[in-house]
Amino acid sequence: MLIRSIFFFTILIFSTCLSSNENIKHHYHKNFNQIKKLAQKINIDAPGTFYCGCKIFWKEKKGIPELNSCGYHIRKNANRANRIEWEHVMPAWQFGHSKSCWKKGGRKNCIHDYNYQKIETDLHNLQPVIGEINGDRSNFMYNQFPKSTLNGQYGQCSMKIDFKNKLVEPPDISKGAISRIYFYMSDFYHFKLSKKQKKLFLMWNKKYNVTNWECMRDNLIFKIQGNHNPYVYSKCQKNNTNKNI
């Protein structure tokens, strides 16, 4: 408990510093299509798709996942399975459904809502994924299932989706990054996480350390967007893998 308190106290101080110093130059892009171009620029050297780790072949504005490189098995939608889409790790529904614009006309009706646009276009929350996975995940919440549950839905990609209960367990390779993105989104945009979510993400954050790519990506986003994810940045600094600033 003491260690956990110290961890959050440290992050709180660091987040406060970021809010006061970096918001001055923090900028967002009104058009989601514009932000997708920047996301491609940031992720051009990504080691693979976010959940499954498939290699990505970039062709002009499009990304094509090499499904054989990660043993991915198409579940149902071959068209979307063969293209890269941009996944909101914290789903647009989670940060948008309570807004009046969403209640009046859904996500499309929020395109002129400034506060919504800031959140939707935050590069820290966008990851390149196989399109079919993006569609299947939808706005389902992350969870942890028993090991014997829902195996093999996507071949060797260990993404598990419980469509009935609208829950998803991502592969281990993405759990740490997911936890740190959620904590960032919660702090930066003042979204309250449930006790269950906090417990799960604390476990993932502790168990799965930052990767070199996470640190590189955080630096690239900083150069474009003007702010770090403190939950990534602090660990990178500790590991001496983030040399920016």
From Swiss-Prot:
Its EC number is 3.1.21.1. Pfam families: Endonuclease_1. It catalyses: Endonucleolytic cleavage to 5'-phosphodinucleotide and 5'-phosphooligonucleotide end-products. InterPro entries: Endonuclease-I, His-Me_finger_sf. GO terms for molecular function: deoxyribonuclease I activity. It comes from the Bacteria. Keywords: Endonuclease, Hydrolase, Nuclease. The keyword Hydrolase applies. Belongs to the EndA/NucM nuclease family. PANTHER family: ENDONUCLEASE-1. Has double-strand break activity. This is Endonuclease-1. It comes from Buchnera aphidicola subsp. Baizongia pistaciae (strain Bp). The lineage of its organism: Bacteria, Pseudomonadati, Pseudomonadota, Gammaproteobacteria, Enterobacterales.
